């Protein structure tokens, strides 16, 4: 389901790039790949691309918490601010990585995603 979601978001992003800037990315390209291709096309430095992508990802997760826990706008903004140093740290660490370093596993996230997929009422796909 996460792969499907990433492709659907990628297709939406790809459509905006094509419609607004006439920049074409192949259909069914995953969102992170679309972001990387767009950053290269628009000459956005890698470090800014990483920071922007991670900040956007964290903000989206926190926005879900604001709406559904609810934690409120103030606490949500505080959470976003608290991510800045970690995002910078991740960006700095990534400067020395290569393709062989890519990978990851999130057992708890995967288990809860599987449980979430089987709920009758769902707010989001994953």
Residue ranges and their predicted role:
Residues 1-68, 78-81:
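Amphipathic alpha-helical interface segments
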Residues 56-126:
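C-terminal auxiliary extensions adjacent to catalytic cores
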């Amino acid at each position: 389901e996460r792969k499907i979601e990433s492709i659907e978001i990628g297709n939406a992003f790809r459509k905006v790039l094509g419609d607004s800037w006439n920049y074409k990315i192949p259909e069914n390209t995953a969102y992170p790949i679309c972001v990387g291709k767009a950053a290269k096309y628009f000459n956005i430095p890698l470090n800014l691309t990483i920071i922007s992508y991670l900040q956007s990802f964290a903000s989206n997760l926190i926005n879900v918490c604001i709406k559904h826990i609810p934690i409120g706008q103030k606490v949500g903004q505080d959470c976003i601010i608290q991510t800045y140093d970690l995002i910078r740290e991740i960006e700095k660490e990534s400067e020395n990585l290569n393709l062989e370093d890519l990978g990851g596993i999130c057992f708890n996230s995967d288990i809860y995603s599987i449980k979430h997929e089987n709920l009758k009422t769902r707010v989001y796909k994953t």
